[in-house]
Amino acid sequence: MFYDQARIFVKGGDGGNGIVSFRREKYVPEGGPNGGDGGDGGNVIFIGDEGLRTLVDFRYQRHYKAERGEHGMGKNMHGRNGQDMTVRVPIGTVVKDAETGKILVDITCDGQQYIAARGGRGGRGNAKFVSSTNRVPLIAEKGEPGEEHWLELELKLLADVGLVGFPNVGKSTLIASVSAARPKIANYHFTTLEPNLGVVRIAEGQSFVMADIPGLIEGAHTGAGLGHDFLRHTERTRYLIHVLDISGSEGRDPLEDYDAINRELALYKPELADKPMVIAANKMDLPGAEENLARLREKLGEGAVIFPISAATRQGLEPLIYHVHKGLEELGPVVFERVTADAHMDVRFTGKTEERFKIHRDEQGVFVVTGKEVERHVAMTDMENEESVARLQRIFDVMGVDQALRDAGCQHGDPVRIGDLDFDFIEYAAQYAERDDDGENG
């Protein structure tokens, strides 16, 4: 099995910040808070597209970031939500977490959507923090950071185009010239023992997969050489390019080669003869090529589609590739096998309540608190605002973070880390005792 792979980074947009603002109008001495909320960040969304065949475009762009939400404004004005970023992927793409290798989703149908990175929630403005005990709140939340991940994309490659022909006619050179494939190339028969696959990129969003089918010999349909293995690969292609050594540099007659290969294809499976096929008259840069090309045209007549090329010098390759691409478009999209997602794919809810946070002590002796909820609260708190910090402390008390730190052995003055926040653990009883000692000594 052959796979196209890509590693990309996705990040949802950060939420916009809420703001602290108060109504200020003439004759309204107690206008009250009117700080608006920040907008939500946009999501990064994968969309299945039956028109795409490869992952080649992800080699040119690896980072995908959605737009962040706008900050809130006064007069209770809500910041605009960030725009989603849509990323089109071929049908059959499997998305994995790059760190764990866990399968996140299998894109199995056209139009299927998957949120690869969710945008952060917009922070609340101070108008949302009014209460009976706090009529003039000076608190506003920062926007929640958007999710970010490194992802592995994997796509099972099915060759659109197969190169057929005798050994040493230049198939490997041709596929190396029109794609990023780098097959082993040498001047002897059966250099290629396994199909070499290359992705031919026409333009952004337009590409196809070409397979260098190992060289055939007469009697291949009976299993001679590696005939059955080689011919089996041609069944999976939609379009064939018959590569001829038109110069006859191997001492064979290219016209006889043409008849022999077509005969082997028809004898193995008659329906192979019905596949669309063009002829690539290769090695036009060598002596004798022009004469043999004229003989071939005379033999096959005006209806034959022949492209004189030299894979070694890249002569005539562009017309051949564009003709094949147009032919594939006329054949229409491939009908893909629908894959049933495994139980571990794209699970939204398992019915199991996860721990709200975990605590461990790292090698430097720092108590590290991890958990999506606690890290979100830290990220959305303005650490320059005393009221916001006090509110964060109350949240931690309610969640039981302080008590859990004590249970883990954390003592007054020990270092603690939550997300990007580093601080020293403070036992308020000890803090007050220190203040009393300072007062007595003063």
Swiss-Prot record:
Enzyme Commission code: 3.6.5.-
GO biological process: ribosome biogenesis
List of residues binding Mg(2+): S172, T192
The Obg domain, residue ranges: 1-158
Keywords: Cytoplasm, GTP-binding, Hydrolase, Magnesium, Metal-binding, Nucleotide-binding
Domain OCT: 349-427
Needed cofactors: Mg(2+)
Name of the protein described by the UniProt record: GTPase Obg
Gene that encodes the chain: obg
